[in-house]
Amino acid sequence: MTQLAIGKPTPLGAHYDGQGVNFTLFSAHAERVELCVFDANGQEHRYDLPGHSGDIWHGYLPDARPGLRYGYRVHGPWQPAEGHRFNPAKLLIDPCARQIDGEFKDNPLLHAGHNEPDYRDNAAIAPKCVVVVDHYDWEDDAPPRTPWGSTIIYEAHVKGLTYLHPEIPVEIRGTYKALGHPVMINYLKQLGITALELLPVAQFASEPRLQRMGLSNYWGYNPVAMFALHPAYACSPETALDEFRDAIKALHKAGIEVILDIVLNHSAELDLDGPLFSLRGIDNRSYYWIREDGDYHNWTGCGNTLNLSHPAVVDYASACLRYWVETCHVDGFRFDLAAVMGRTPEFRQDAPLFTAIQNCPVLSQVKLIAEPWDIAPGGYQVGNFPPLFAEWNDHFRDAARRFWLHYDLPLGAFAGRFAASSDVFKRNDRLPSAAINLVTAHDGFTLRDCVCFNHKHNEANGEENRDGTNNNYSNNHGKEGLGGTLDLVERRRDSIHALLTTLLLSQGTPMLLAGDEHGHSQHGNNNAYCQDNQLTWLDWSQASSGLTAFTAALIHLRKRIPALVENRWWEEGDGNVRWLNRYAQPLSTDEWQNGPKQLQILLSDRFLIAINATLEVTEIVLPAGEWHAIPPFAGEDNPVITAVWQGPAHGLCVFQR
């Protein structure tokens, strides 16, 4: 039997050098590590890793080749009260595995035990890692590096975006390949999108609870192998990586960046009753935040929390991010529940992972976007991330909805959000682009549902409608649900137009949820994380071409307004913005706080957004000059020259002089 050589302690993972494979695994508390390799018949062969450099276990297997399936058995104490849950009866996934063979099914054998260890062997049914070799011709690929001030983000799900698209070949719908298909790229270009932000593509598992209900994790925020692509989105699991890179290369040629939503806050091992896949059995005490009683700190709502202040876990996370940039040429990341990244355990701007990213010549050059909260005390950190990060701006989301749908927001508060929430983000040399403005996202109502439903309708999720937020700031305009009279449909359309205009013509970086531009509805489900079906897949056959054209025209208008693309904070008298009342006069202090919801926003001294958010038709006197309404509020060939605008109830219009 071939013996393992000592090998090298770096890099982490399994790496083929042309002659054999070097294996490395971090574990600070293990007493022994076995490499388990499986032949074509599924026969297991075990080797003790002979090298032990610090906390890195390593060994080199001569003559091993790509395609080899492997896993680990890690020996150490079973001391739950101390946070140690070693169980060598369980085959474990390499945290740095590039490909996984097998499915993460709900099975008692994939659990290590709660108070007492479960010593039943699970190698027969446990997923296996696969050694891969990486050769890819990037040709002349170069990152678009779109300036932040010109960035328009489109948040989409790999499968949901194209699975029902009639113009994309059936065999590639819902896959990585479809993202790079000319039909999809041309659509994004015509819409004006500069960055495609994908919900998680790293391999994830469906929670056992969902599997028992016949559901699955659709969004992907339940990671199990952070270096491996989710194989269900590939035409062939063996070629997933190249399919993904082909799509990125095609998007880059069209000038479109690719941003990955990445989950570095928890793992699919969930709480102590959850499955054992990898980290818990490799070094539970190091990888997770552990309470004094040995249980997990659940700062994520998912049962566990990764300890991103531990040096080895920081190295793991940094290596993962570098992998996606260097191997897949992604242009940035959106970090789920990103406050966890800064926990020490209190949140700090100089937390180890933030410092590692800041000091990395690769990661410091890509777009970094934080979801700036977690669910623990002190977890709401909007505006407090280091200068390299932009942040989801929930202040903007709530303000836009309250202003147009609940009518309870003063003009001053609305203007503050329109001006990139400078009270929140204008600090530490940050720019307006640090505010990622959104009206909707994957999590919550779609834009159409915001104007059709007052209440969430999540019964299909199997939790008796308890899940999902109740704070939606939505307005069904008098009837719960889709459809209705022509008057109702028109009022809802006007509200959608107002919200889209607010999003796409405000200062900051706009993020559009895929499907909002053509009227996609989830029928009132505001937490569709487990709905892999027609509720979430975009139905292109029912798309509103008029709304799509309206959205595209707004995006192209945005790109013409210097005050929005120059990415500089607006200052008094700099010519970027003037705030005027319905008579074209500067607003008084009282009007800002108590005045009617009527406002004129003059941008770059020649673009005017006139707003009437009251219930009545109102005359708005435009500033001096010759004004004409511009697309999408008027046709190119028949501009309306006007000095007074008859503002419809809950309406707005954009003019140019």
Swiss-Prot record:
Name under which the protein is recorded: Glycogen debranching enzyme
GO MF term set: glycogen debranching enzyme activity; hydrolase activity, hydrolyzing O-glycosyl compounds
Function according to Swiss-Prot or TrEMBL: Removes maltotriose and maltotetraose chains that are attached by 1,6-alpha-linkage to the limit dextrin main chain, generating a debranched limit dextrin.
Record pathway: Glycan degradation; glycogen degradation
Any Pfam family hit: Alpha-amylase
Keywords in alphabetical order: Carbohydrate metabolism, Glycogen metabolism, Glycosidase, Hydrolase
Site feature: Transition state stabilizer: D443
Species annotation: Escherichia coli (strain SMS-3-5 / SECEC)
SUPFAM superfamilies recorded: (Trans)glycosidases, E set domains
Catalytic activity entry: Hydrolysis of (1->6)-alpha-D-glucosidic linkages to branches with degrees of polymerization of three or four glucose residues in limit dextrin
Region of interest (Disordered), residue spans: 460-479
Protein family according to the UniProt entry: Belongs to the glycosyl hydrolase 13 family.
GO biological process terms held by the UniProt record: glycogen catabolic process
Enzyme Commission numbers on file: 3.2.1.196
